């Protein structure tokens, strides 16, 4: 996990940037592949997401991912947010809620 010196000064947030190293996937996906839309084995993607989630927040079961659609749509997570298995279609996540890890998957894009 790579961290930002400036973001690390913020005591109320935990953050991290992950590269392809340290994952459970094998074959052509041999990496920390967290992309449920890939053709990787589902159980490997779930294990990789668990690795990421545990490094960010061990006290929760889930991590919020988006189905990115290259739009202006933003997901706002508030106290009424409920996890479900269907990914939300949006391109950004904002939350002030504790213990709800959020993630944006990127390939050739730079996360902001």
Residue ranges: model-predicted function:
Residues 1-112:
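Active-site microenvironment for binding and transforming phosphate-containing groups
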């Amino acid at each position: 996990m790579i961290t930002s010196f400036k973001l690390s000064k913020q005591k109320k947030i935990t953050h991290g940037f992950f590269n392809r190293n340290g994952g459970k996937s094998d074959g052509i996906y041999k990496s920390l592949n967290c992309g449920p839309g890939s053709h990787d084995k589902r159980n490997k993607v779930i294990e990789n997401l668990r690795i990421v989630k545990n490094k960010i927040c061990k006290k929760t079961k889930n991590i919020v991912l988006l189905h990115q659609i290259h739009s202006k749509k933003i997901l706002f997570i508030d106290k009424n947010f409920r996890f479900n298995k269907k990914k939300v279609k949006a391109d950004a996540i904002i939350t002030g809620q504790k213990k709800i890890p959020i993630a944006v998957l990127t390939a050739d894009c730079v996360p902001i």
